[in-house]
């Protein structure tokens, strides 16, 4: 009976693979340590693509604001000057760029000034320019262009200065002086009789002055009469 049990134990031992295989299995199990799982990586603060996109948008907004302010300031400054394209094309085409840049610019505060009467402007003499006449000025000081032979010009009788017809008409519509010498007397003495009679405002002002003068004279005569009467009464007493 004992031998049978021993045989069964040997068979079981051999079936398990022997002692060496058993020890190797035990050593492998005990020697292999458990590998810890790596910790999760923290999320990135800002993606590089997103940062580049935000930077480009900020630069674009900056340039848009800068150019909008610049063009608005340029438009405001250019609106305060008079457009010289309204001048006659025949004269503006002859003007050089240097003279064009130094043309007369009319500012806003002087737009309300009242110039010469239109009838007086039309009464200025007009003739054709000739170099043989030896005029006082050989170019128009308003548009800064030279006179051409046979060109129609307008002269101011008192000082003798000549200008282009359109230029001097535009000037005299805002001013009452010569553009060159700034003299406020435009007509000579012999042409004064040809001027139109004074307007209604000046006539009323003249009548008012006459009435005031008459009242002053009457008051002075009354005061002198009263003084004379009082003097006679004192002498009689």
UniProtKB/Swiss-Prot annotation:
Catalytic activity line of the entry: S-ubiquitinyl-[E2 ubiquitin-conjugating enzyme]-L-cysteine + [acceptor protein]-L-lysine = [E2 ubiquitin-conjugating enzyme]-L-cysteine + N(6)-ubiquitinyl-[acceptor protein]-L-lysine
TM ranges: 51-71
Top EC category: transferase
Pathway assignment: Protein modification; protein ubiquitination
UniProt signal peptide: none
GO cellular component annotations of the record: membrane
Protein name (Swiss-Prot/TrEMBL): RING-H2 finger protein ATL57
Gene (name only): ATL57
């Amino acid at each position: 009976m004992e031998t049978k049990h021993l045989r069964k134990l040997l068979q079981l031992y051999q079936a398990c693979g022997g002692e060496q295989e058993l020890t190797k299995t035990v050593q492998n199990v005990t020697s292999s340590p458990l590998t810890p799982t790596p910790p999760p990586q923290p999320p990135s603060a800002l993606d590089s693509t997103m940062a580049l996109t935000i930077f480009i948008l900020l630069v674009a907004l900056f340039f848009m604001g800068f150019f909008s302010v610049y063009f608005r300031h340029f438009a405001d400054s250019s609106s305060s000057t008079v457009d010289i394209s309204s001048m006659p094309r025949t004269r503006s085409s002859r003007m050089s760029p240097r003279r064009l840049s130094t043309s007369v610019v009319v500012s806003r505060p002087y737009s309300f000034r009242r110039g010469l009467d239109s009838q007086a402007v039309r009464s200025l003499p007009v003739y054709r320019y000739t170099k043989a006449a030896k005029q006082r000025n050989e170019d128009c000081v308003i548009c800064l262009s030279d006179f051409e032979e046979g060109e129609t010009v307008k002269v101011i009788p008192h000082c003798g200065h000549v200008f282009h017809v359109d230029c001097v008409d535009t000037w005299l519509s805002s001013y009452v002086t010569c553009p060159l010498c700034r003299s406020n007397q435009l007509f000579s003495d012999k042409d004064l009789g040809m001027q139109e009679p004074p307007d209604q405002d000046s006539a009323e002002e003249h009548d008012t002055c006459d009435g005031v003068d008459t009242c002053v004279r009457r008051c002075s005569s009354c005061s002198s009469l009263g003084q004379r009467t009082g003097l006679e009464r004192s002498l009689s007493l």
